[in-house]
């Protein structure tokens, strides 16, 4: 008589443990978004109806990378489970106005459906991204696009910018695999649109730029803007300049 009773108790214990484990499962919102918007404050919606059940020890995450050039804004966003990490909210402004602006936000959290941000307003101040005055001397090709820019009009730069930037961001992770081409006005020196930060939440970012001399204009004494000639350009011009130099000497 004792043995069946013990078996019943064991079954109840197993069922209880199973119910307890299922009650501790972590559920996260899941979704991806890659878009370019002219009015992200009103047009971008970060809500999703998909749900993901996480493995043991995982967290929920929501991560977004925002890149603004001129009047266009590229947005790459991901929500879902993350296998490891620490609970934290991280906001980084990689490139500040005036000119090109890059901001990232990531939230790692431990409660079900805690990755529930639905808009950009909580960490992106749209009123601060518009320049009030522009330069009359510095103009730069300006665009941001997923993949490649098919049009990059030369636009007057905001006061406070000193050079033109051109580069490409290769982004992988968090379900995202994409490249973003960026051109525009900036005050930063070199290929540092991401300020040297290579990881944004589960996303890894690789920044690549063409020859930096081609993206660093300077102003002449009369206020005009010119581009330095790279070394290979001088090598091409030298044979043309030598005969004139010999003739006048």
UniProtKB/Swiss-Prot annotation:
Transmembrane segments: none annotated. The keyword Signal applies. One of its GO terms (cellular component) is extracellular region. GO terms for biological process: binding of sperm to zona pellucida; fertilization; flagellated sperm motility; regulation of flagellated sperm motility. Residues 1-25 form the signal peptide. Detected in testis and spermatogonia. Not detected in spermatocytes. Detected in blood leukocytes. SUPFAM superfamilies: Snake toxin-like (SSF57302). A lipid is attached at residue 222 (GPI-anchor amidated asparagine). The keyword Phosphoprotein does not apply. InterPro entries: Fert-Immune_med_protein (IPR051899), LY6_UPA_recep-like (IPR016054), Snake_toxin-like_sf (IPR045860). It comes from the Eukaryota. It is a lipid-anchor; GPI-anchor. It holds the Pfam family UPAR_LY6. Plays a role in fertilization by controlling binding of sperm to zona pellucida and migration of spermatozoa into the oviduct. May play a role in signal transduction and promote protein tyrosine phosphorylation. Interacts with VAMP3. Interacts with LY6K. Interacts with DPEP3; co-localized on the cell surface of spermatocytes, spermatids, and testicular spermatozoa, co-localized only in cytoplasmic droplets of caput and corpus epididymal sperm. Interacts with ADAM5. This is Testis-expressed protein 101. It comes from Homo sapiens. The gene is TEX101.
